């Protein structure tokens, strides 16, 4: 989630035509989903201009709550249905008004379900937006069971017109967001769902080459390629990366050829496999997941 905020902040600093077409919105969670730096640079939208109340009253605040007609963040109350109604409307601006916007909404991941009806209709109309669900999983467990999201990956997979990603590392997220903004404009594209977390994850020191970037966008890659005779491979998605890396270290002596497969989009992997595997007899090319697993012997255990 922190990386998401930094990426948006960099867009704001560049002040390009692209960044001027980004519109962010959130249901009362803008600061806690790392939109703060973006808002400080781009301001809040309102038809009536108003100054920063905190500054006027000399109250210390890291945020600049300045409202104007040129602001690029729309602050909502705790109303997730309104969030998706807004994303749907802004995501159709190119069809309605001939001007492309890039709507980005942030929401606590467990509360995506509050706005499913509006999200479904937005996707049905082919609205183009990016929804960022964060924090996800059990990151918000101290706030109660209702704040834990376990089933939201199923929403991402099952919703037509919405492509879901769950990256573990910042460089993956950057590549996915760059691709995502092009996907929003593609005639055959759609909307993007990013499932992120506030959990700290050790970042790999690497440069993403073209092949690795393509694998990330297709939905998966080998974080650690298996040896010639792997007894096991470990498959993970998202913030489980820390546990998987530790487990691989513990198991290294016993299973030297073990591989680690990182899944960035189970949605993409499944949909491509389904399209290419309608009939195994007529299959002319392998899906990405089949390409990844072709180096794994049939009797290898998958964890």
Regions found by a protein language model. Give the residues of each.
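Hydrophobic helix-cap positions at the C-terminus of alpha-helices
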Residues: 11-15, 90, 94, 122, ...
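Residue-level signal for short, function-critical loop segments
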Residues: 28-30, 107-110, 135, 198, ...
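Thiamine diphosphate
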Residues: 34-154, 157, 164, 172-178, 245, 261, ...
């Amino acid at each position: 989630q922190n990386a998401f905020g930094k990426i948006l902040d960099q867009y704001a600093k560049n002040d390009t035509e692209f960044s001027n077409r980004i519109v962010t919105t959130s249901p009362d969670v803008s600061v806690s989903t790392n939109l703060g730096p973006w808002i400080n640079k781009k301001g809040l939208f309102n038809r009536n201009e108003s100054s920063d109340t905190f500054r006027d009253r000399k109250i210390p605040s890291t945020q600049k709550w300045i409202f104007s007609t040129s602001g690029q963040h729309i602050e909502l109350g705790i109303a997730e249905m309104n969030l998706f109604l807004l994303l749907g409307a802004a995501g159709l601006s190119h069809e309605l008004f001939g001007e492309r916007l890039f709507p980005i909404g942030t929401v606590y991941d467990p509360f995506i379900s509050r706005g499913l009806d509006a999200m479904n209709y937005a996707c049905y109309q082919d609205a183009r937006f990016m929804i960022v669900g964060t924090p996800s999983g059990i990151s918000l467990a101290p706030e109660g069971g209702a704040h834990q999201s376990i089933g939201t990956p199923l929403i991402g997979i099952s919703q037509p017109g919405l492509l879901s990603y769950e990256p573990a590392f910042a460089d993956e997220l950057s590549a996915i967001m760059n691709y995502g903004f092009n996907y929003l404009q593609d005639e055959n594209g759609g909307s993007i769902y990013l499932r992120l977390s506030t959990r700290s994850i050790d970042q790999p020191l690497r440069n993403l080459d073209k092949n690795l970037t393509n694998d990330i966008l297709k939905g998966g890659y080998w974080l650690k390629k298996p040896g010639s005779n792997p007894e096991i491979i470990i498959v993970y998605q998202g913030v489980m990366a820390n546990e998987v890396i530790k487990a691989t270290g513990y198991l290294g002596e016993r299973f030297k050829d073990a591989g680690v497969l990182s899944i960035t989009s189970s949605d993409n992997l499944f949909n491509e496999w389904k399209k290419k595997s309608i009939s195994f007899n007529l299959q002319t090319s392998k899906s990405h997941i089949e390409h990844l697993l072709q180096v794994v012997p049939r009797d290898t255990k998958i964890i």
